[in-house]
Amino acid sequence: MLAKARTINEYLSPLSTEKRAALGRLRETIRSIIPEAEECITYGIPSFRLAGVVVAGFCATAKGCSYFPFSGSTLGTLAHELQAYGQTKSSLHFRPDTALPETLVRKLIKARIAEKKSGASQGQPAPELISK
């Protein structure tokens, strides 16, 4: 059994070339949108944290890749734009050969940050987060 990854590079390293490339592109997209975010591993998946709040993450799955907003309500706010993707309440699924568009990732991150600023996801005020 492989040891748990402690960094995003460690997470990506053993993946297939196709999944590593797809998630590497998503990582760069997220970093370009929120360059001030701290990279971390949360619940075993690569994640991005602003002011102590995880606002985005991704992982490889048996059938492809997933994006996580770390909220059960963020995806619902953009439901009309996500119809082409498989999803659960808290994850968006995509094929490694079909990258998530940068504009969509930007909207997902903005929605998550707005949700945390309003305290909507837990019914309480959120820490100050960067506006983009």
Predicted regions and their residues:
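Charge-dense, helix-prone N-terminal extensions
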Residues: M1-K132
